[in-house]
Amino acid sequence: MPIVDSGSVPALTAAEKATIRTAWAPVYAKYQSTGVDILIKFFTSNPAAQAFFPKFQGLTSADQLKKSMDVRWHAERIINAVNDAVVAMDDTEKMSLKLRELSGKHAKSFQVDPQYFKVLAAVIVDTVLPGDAGLEKLMSMICILLRSSY
């Protein structure tokens, strides 16, 4: 299933949730380094996205990005937001509330182009569990909810 960012929020099966939790645990155990790696992959393949992060301007190499405290801080926030969604897979109302709030911030305060949510989600899937339909569904849930304020 490809990652989508519109339509109805897909439901996860118990087996998909179990697979996601199992795959996510070692990723989250190294959340700082994994988060930075994901963000660097995202910026490397989508350099225009870096314009939405004023504090990242002038960081032109992967090494500069990796050493930046601002990049590390934001990467940690992304990984923690995904972790919140993983933890809340059994409480979609809680997940929805948190992600809709995050959507409002990204739409109104940061004016992020919402197309990048899906692109970043694909990088996360490729890093955590490439091609897994359940994780793609979870990322679709996140992307749909993050677009809710646009």
Swiss-Prot record:
SS bond partners: none
InterPro entries: Globin, Globin-like_sf, Globin/Proto, Globin_lamprey/hagfish
Domain of life per record: Eukaryota
Binding site for heme b: H74, H106
Domain (Globin) ranges: 11-150
Molecular-function GO term, any one: oxygen carrier activity
One Pfam family cited in the UniProt record for this chain: Globin
Keywords: Heme, Iron, Metal-binding, Oxygen transport, Transport
SUBUNIT field: Monomer.
Protein family according to the UniProt entry: Belongs to the globin family.
Other notes: This is one of the minor globin component of Sea lamprey.
Protein name (Swiss-Prot/TrEMBL): Globin-1
